[in-house]
Amino acid sequence: PYHPNPAIAERYDCKVAIDKLVWDFRVNGSELCKRQLLEIIEDVVLRDIMLRECTMRLNGLKVVYQFCMQEHIEDLRYITQVQADKLEKYADTAYAKELAERELRECQKYLFCHAKNILWDSTVWYLERLHLEQYRVNPSNPVKKFSFMGIEKRENREILQEYMKYCLGVTH
């Protein structure tokens, strides 16, 4: 397998089935979505994690990629619940479905938490990015995210997001 860093390429040499490492980014689909997934794939590959965990993550990401290309998903930040529910069709086993669903959530989290600016129009907000004061978080049952994926009508979702920003005390 090729990677610009030879040490990383060597890590995967002869240890993983090659089909798990081959990604065809020439497929028709959103360039933004492809770039988002490529950034996440690179992050996974560069992490110092066990090869088994890395392989599981790549397997899930591959199903997410195939799903996004076939469903013409433009941007992972705006996936709705109806779209996410379709993901199960793209996995051939219950295990692959579970991996893909987990990776879709991880993609959303990565994109929200690593963006230069907070992406207030995303369909999922992760509160770790908002750095709320300790007194505003219930330590026995902390809320980790707000999901707006179930709100299909864009205008309604935007109104609720503005209201949630108000509730959180965010004015920018």
Positions of predicted regions on the chain:
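Charge-rich, intrinsically disordered N-terminal extensions
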Residues: 1-172
